């Protein structure tokens, strides 16, 4: 099992905008080889931002990497540059492999 998480710092007061973007977007993940599960998680709120993480589970690192090179990935991220004003910076990718 392989887990990929992108952490997003969202400008305070723009949380609903961010959640709407994710609720309404097509992730193009269904049917992708090795894809298991996706969740959008909300974390702590700080003075000037709220923390979110997109959380996807894959059969293996190889499946995740293959997806990042696919047309499905390009389609899922085609509007990534829009709404830049709601982010405090670029997302931070963190990846994990199951050990136990």
Predicted feature locations:
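Glycine-rich beta-strand-turn "strand-cap" elements at beta-sheet edges
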Residues: 2, 39-48, 78-100
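Short, well-ordered beta-strand segments in beta-rich or mixed alpha/beta enzyme
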Residues: 3-8, 39-70
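Short, surface-exposed ligand-recognition loops at beta-strand->loop->(often short) alpha-helix junctions
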Residues: 10-18
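Short amphipathic alpha-helical coupling segments at ligand-binding clamshell hinges
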Residues: 17-21, 67
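Short amphipathic alpha-helical/adjacent loop interface patches that line ligand
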Residues: 22, 26
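An amphipathic, aromatic/His-enriched active-site/gating alpha helix that lines ligand/cofactor pockets
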Residues: 27-36, 57-92
């Amino acid at each position: 099992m392989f887990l990929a998480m992108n952490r997003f710092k969202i400008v305070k007061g723009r949380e609903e905008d961010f959640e709407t973007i994710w609720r309404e977007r097509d992730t193009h993940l269904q049917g992708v080889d090795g894809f298991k599960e996706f969740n959008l998680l909300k974390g702590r709120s700080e003075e000037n931002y709220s923390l979110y993480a997109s959380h996807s589970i894959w059969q293996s690192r190889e499946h995740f990497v293959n997806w990042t090179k696919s047309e499905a990935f390009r389609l899922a991220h085609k509007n990534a540059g829009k709404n830049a004003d709601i982010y405090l910076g670029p997302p931070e990718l963190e990846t994990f492999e199951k050990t136990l």
